[in-house]
């Protein structure tokens, strides 16, 4: 089992150095900045309109909570999309690229089972996707909380479902990457 963890650690490090990860991080940070600024201005406009239309504090508070919940769900939906795209892009050329370049031959000649190689890559990418999802979802939730004081119910359940969705896409990507070239893998996964 030790070779699996070594390969997972090496896969994690390798993926962190790839340009696609840098692009994903820049895209994620850009999204968080735009979401925070947009949410601030939308929230200010909604509060002005709610105060004018609803003199009752109770009704205004309920409407405000519903609106905050809706915008937070929209932000988390975008996080889910970015996580799934990252899962598909990270694994698309992993095994196919190593097979084409011949680097996989130096790994599998060692006394390591092929299933350990694939499992190690899967665990490395799973850890990276989990970290990416936590950073992105944490940014959305923190942005909404700092501006409104609102925290959603069942956040852990929702994030775990987003993570499982990303893991399924990553698993399909690694499966296709072991049998097809990188371009075909990307086409299959994004076609799903």
Predicted regions and their residues:
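Helix-loop-helix units of permease transmembrane domains in multi-pass membrane transporters
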Residues: 93-126
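Pore- or pathway-lining transmembrane helices of multi-pass membrane proteins that form conduits
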Residues: 21-29, 182-192
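A helix-boundary/kink motif common to multi-pass secondary transporters
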Residues: 17, 100, 113, 180-181
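Aromatic- and glycine-rich beta-strand/loop motifs that create alpha-glucan
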Residues: 1-25
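Secretory targeting signals
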Residues: 33-89, 118-186
